[in-house]
Amino acid sequence: IKQNKLAFFSLIMIILIILCAVFANVICRYNPYTQSLKDRLLAPSFAHPLGTDELGRDTLTRIIFGARISLTIGLIPTLISMFIGTILGLVAGYFGGKIDFIIMRFADIMLAFPSLLLAMVVMYTMGGGLINIFIALSLVNWASTSRVVRSETLSLSKKEYVEAAKSMGVNNATIIFRHVLPNCIPTLVVLFTLSIPSAILSESSLSFLGVGAQPPTASWGLMVVSAKKYLFTQPVLVLAPAIAIMIVVLAFNFLGDGLRDILDPYLKER
């Protein structure tokens, strides 16, 4: 990955962001939830590099703690949705027939609706909160993974080593998890990396629309919506979390593109 400078730089950036999120309690000297009305809407200074919000909370501290929320929401729902999509894609591609038809038609229905709209419906039904965000994003994002894995499985099922395993009487589960799934991993790695930004943006959008993270959670999307009325008087309150979202999303996208370029020769050879 060092040969792709942009992807390597993005990887370093992601590692630094993760370290900041993990050690936020050590790095930050302020509590992200402690209010101080006498310090509200302070301009950037040495004590508060990005100023303070309308409740006197340090903006930089809330952005660092907000990285925990964004990365967690980027990783956990993506892992869950990819697990669901991978299992369904493997089953549909390997067995075919009516099973394939039912799973893929259900996936088509899910893909026919905007994922953000479906997530909003789920959130309105279950209510706000981080756990419900995990559930909503996991339920609406599995379909694209299932289609990709199904396509890979259809191709791999025709390989000689798979046909040989079938002729030797190896059971289907062993063939799927020993011969088919391992060869899908390079594609899944790239797909996973490129899916994380989508989940982060979805969480930010849901929070911005008022159905995602709830106050006083230090969420980047929630910080943007809380500070939008100060856009012209205290623009850093809006720009800081917006730029944080942009940096993380771009870093994961560039890393995903780099991994795709690295793994592309392997995928073509396979």
Model-predicted regions and their roles:
Residues I1-T86, L90-V91, G97-K98, A112, ...:
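Gly/Trp-centered helix-boundary motif
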Residues F9-M13, I73-P77, I103-F106, A119, ...:
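Hydrophobic core positions of alpha-helical segments in small-molecule transporters
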Residues I17, L90, A119-Y124, I133, ...:
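Transmembrane alpha-helix boundary and packing residues in multipass membrane permease domains
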Residues I17-I18, M82, D108, Y124, ...:
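Residue-level recognition of pore/gate-forming positions within transmembrane alpha-helices
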Residues A24-P32, G93-G97, V122-G128, V140, ...:
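Short helix-capping/hinge motifs at transmembrane helix termini and TM-loop junctions
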Residues P49, D53, T59, F83-G85, ...:
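Generic hydrophobic transmembrane alpha-helix motif, especially the helices
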Residues R57-T72, I76, G96-M104, L154-K158, ...:
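Amphipathic cytosolic juxtamembrane alpha-helices at the membrane-cytosol interface
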Residues M123-T125, L137, E152-T153, L201-A244, ...:
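Glycine-rich helix-loop "coupling/hinge" segments at transmembrane-helix boundaries
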